[in-house]
A protein has these predicted regions:
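Acidic, amphipathic alpha-helical patches
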Residues: 18-20, 82-83, 203, 212
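Short, conserved catalytic or adaptor-binding loops enriched in Gly and charged residues
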Residues: 29-33, 198-199
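Long, low-complexity Q/N-rich tracts
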Residues: 1-10
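Cap/lid segment of the alpha/beta-hydrolase catalytic domain
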Residues: 33-135, 141
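A short, aliphatic-rich alpha-helical micro-motif
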Residues: 24, 58, 216-219
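Active-site-proximal cap/loop segments of hydrolase catalytic domains
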Residues: 98-290
C-alpha cells in the first residue's frame, strides 16, 4: 500500500505563497498597553439609584467625567477603548447611567421628559460624580467633563449651570439648541416632541428653556467643540452657535471640524480622524488640568 500522506503543516493557509511569507507582528505585539480595571458602585442620589463606574489611575491625577449619548443608551460592564485611552493618558475616568438611560425599565427611561429634562438627569450625573470621587478617594480637584450627542448636551448644560465645577470641557456632536434642531436635524420632527412632550409651535418657550445655548453666557470653562460637517443628527450649526458665543465673550475655546464625517465619527469615522480626535481631547484636557 502507498505510504500515508504527510501531516499538515502547523499553520495551514489555502494559498501556499502567502503561507510561506514571514508573518508580521500583530497589533497586540506592537501596541501593548496596560488595561485599567473599573470599580463599580450603585449610588443612591436621594431621588434615584444610579449605576456608576470609575477607572482609577491615581488619587493625585485629574479626573474626567464622561457622559453617554442617547439619552436612551447606557454604559455597562464591558471594555471601552475610550476610557482606557484616557486612563493611559493619566486621567481617572468616571461615568454613570443617569435617569433617561436604557436598561432600567420604561419609567426610568422616560423620567427626563418634559420639564424633567435637564433636571433629573443633571441631579443624577452631578451627584454620582461627587460620590465616585469620594469612593475612589481622589484628592486632585482638577476635573474635566465631556460627552457626545446627548452627552454633549449634558456637558454644555452642566458647565452652564455649575460653571465653577469643571476646569475643562469637551462638547462633541451636541444638541445645544432645540429651536434650531427642529428645522435642521434628520430627527427634528419627532425627537424634540418625544422628549419635551410639547409641539414646537405650541410651546417655543419650553424649547428655549431646555436648550444649553440659552445659558451659554454662564460658561467660563475652557471648552473644545468637536463636530462633523456631515452630521445630520445634530447638525454642525449647533456647535457653531456655542463656539460663536464663547469666542464673542472671550472664553477660551476652540472648534474642531471634521470634513466628510457624520454623527458616528468616534465609532466609525476614518481612522486618521479618530486618531486626531483622541489626540485633541487628551491634549485639551492635559492643557487645562495638568
Amino acid at each position: 500500500p502507498p505510504p500515508p500522506p504527510p501531516p499538515p503543516p502547523p499553520f495551514c493557509h489555502p494559498h501556499a505563497a502567502i503561507r510561506d511569507q514571514p508573518r508580521s507582528r500583530g497589533l497586540g505585539d506592537v501596541y501593548k498597553r496596560q488595561s485599567y480595571e473599573c470599580v463599580y458602585k450603585r449610588i443612591d442620589t436621594g431621588k434615584s439609584k444610579i449605576d456608576a463606574w470609575g477607572i482609577f489611575v491615581g488619587k493625585n491625577n485629574p479626573t474626567l467625567l464622561s457622559i453617554h449619548g442617547g439619552p436612551a443608551a447606557q454604559y455597562g460592564f464591558n471594555y471601552f477603548d475610550e476610557f482606557q485611552t484616557y486612563a493611559e493618558a493619566g486621567f481617572n475616568v468616571i461615568a454613570c447611567n443617569p435617569r433617561g438611560s436604557s436598561g432600567r425599565g420604561h419609567k426610568f427611561l422616560r423620567d427626563v421628559c418634559g420639564n424633567k429634562w435637564g433636571v433629573n438627569d443633571t441631579h443624577d450625573v452631578v451627584t454620582a460624580f461627587k460620590e465616585m470621587v469620594k469612593e475612589m478617594k481622589i484628592s486632585n480637584k482638577n476635573y474635566g467633563i465631556m460627552g457626545g450627542s446627548y452627552g454633549g448636551f449634558m456637558t454644555a448644560w452642566v458647565i452652564s449651570h455649575y460653571p465653577k465645577m469643571f476646569k475643562s470641557s469637551v462638547v462633541e456632536r451636541a444638541l445645544l439648541n432645540w429651536e434650531t434642531m427642529v428645522g435642521t436635524s434628520d430627527i427634528g420632527i419627532t425627537f424634540p416632541e418625544m422628549y419635551l412632550l410639547e409641539k414646537f409651535d405650541k410651546n417655543i418657550n419650553l424649547y428655549r428653556k431646555k436648550s444649553p445655548i440659552t445659558y451659554a453666557n454662564n460658561i467660563i470653562a475652557p471648552t473644545l467643540i468637536i463636530h462633523s460637517e456631515n452630521d445630520y443628527r445634530c447638525p454642525i450649526e449647533q456647535g457653531e452657535q456655542l463656539f460663536s458665543n464663547l469666542k464673542r465673550r472671550g472664553v477660551e475655546s476652540a472648534m474642531m471640524r471634521f470634513p466628510a464625517e457624520s454623527h458616528e465619527l468616534s465609532r466609525s469615522g476614518q481612522p486618521v480622524h479618530r486618531k486626531q480626535r483622541f489626540e485633541a481631547i487628551i491634549n485639551w484636557h492635559k492643557k487645562h488640568l495638568t
